[in-house]
Amino acid sequence: SACSSQGGSRPGTLTLWTHSAGGTDEYAVIETIANDFNAANPGTKIQITAFPQAGYNDSIVTAAAAHELPDILDLDGPIMPNWAWSGYLAQLDLPASLTDAMVDSAKGYFNGALYSVGPYDTSLCFLARRSAFQAAGIAVPTIARPWTRDEFDAALKRLSELPDYEFAVDMSVWDTAEWWPYAYAPMLQSFGGDIIDRDTLTTADGFLNGSDAVAFGTWFRSLFADGLASQTPGTDGTDFLQGKVPMVYAGGWKVLKAQETFGADEVLILPPVDFGRGAKVGGGSWQWAVSASSKNRETATRFIEFLMQDDYLVMYSDAIGTYPSIESAIPGTENYGAGKPLEPVYEIGKAYALLRPATPGYKVISSVVDKALHDIVSGADVRKTLDQAVKDIDADIRANDGYRPE
């Protein structure tokens, strides 16, 4: 069914597009849910088309231009406001009993209306070797009491002095695309800066280039300049798994592999650092939506509601290591719940998740912030780089009339 298109759909057929290319664990879950829905609704058929993630957003934009969007589609949380603003998506009419039970970071609101919901979310954390912390005499921070900046800096210095490791920490700068804004903007926000004025969504001036933002950029650059972190770590977090570094900043989806490698007791799952304005991590992951052009909106919405049942949220979690977006599903999962291996990842997300700003301009903000941070790590002047980033973001907002609803 991967080559089926919207054009050939028969009556009673709903088309569904997903970023989970065929053969992946997530695809298998979606297929199971679709088959169950088809069985429960004779006369209705969900027809799945799967895309590789890399080209998925482009496929949606192209289909929208040709008026060939599917009935049901998944989307990465931060892109939703742009697609809602562009008229691709229908508002979702879901029962309050469902939406009230969901974590906030899995609900996609734009201009006060709900457009997408996600079966899961995940979180960021520091993973560290317990033995290294013991050798360096470092106290372990807790979710209730995360590191301060001074404590974190002191811990990095001590870890860097251990003879067994090349660097103190892998900050995962090998990763690309949405990773840099997702992973490092929360640190900027903890310093007191931001990537845009969240209240008005009309400017980045004073937020991305104020004194707090400059302090963040200077500190971030120093990690690499002072030799605490590598500018060229191995891809995919291999430095930590190979014992080259005692700590890595990573997504919750990296925890199981680390526990398999070193044993669960040796792997500390640590919260983000409180740089002054509270600890923060990125929130929001893949979510489901209905296209505005769908002639089967009601059935499409029913499918999304069907997919959000606890049993399926458990299935998603067990397949891909994310946590369910509804608390009642958590005890049924392999990895989440009291005493289970990924429980701290959920607690960190619940305590500290900050959504990326819900503006149609986020796509541009994301790429501008990504470039600015890369330049800063490479040694560019922090203030000048951030001033230029603000100019670029504000110019885009102006060029789109402030992204007001059309």
Model-inferred region functions:
Residues 1-81, 88, 275-277, 298-299, ...:
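Conserved N-terminal structural module of periplasmic/extracytoplasmic solute-binding proteins
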Residues 75-125, 180-183, 187, 268-270, ...:
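Hinge/lid segment of periplasmic solute-binding proteins
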Residues 29, 130, 305-327:
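Periplasmic-binding protein-like
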Residues 110, 115-119, 124, 150-204, ...:
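Extracytoplasmic/periplasmic solute-binding protein
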Residues 19, 38, 80, 182-186, ...:
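Extracytoplasmic/periplasmic substrate-binding proteins
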Residues 153-158, 198-231:
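Glycine-centered hinge/linker elements that transmit conformational signals in sensory
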Residues 50-59, 78, 146-151, 230-242:
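Short helix-initiation/N-cap motifs at beta->coil->alpha
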Residues 318-371, 402-406:
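Long, aromatic- and glycine/proline-rich binding clefts that accommodate carbohydrate-like moieties
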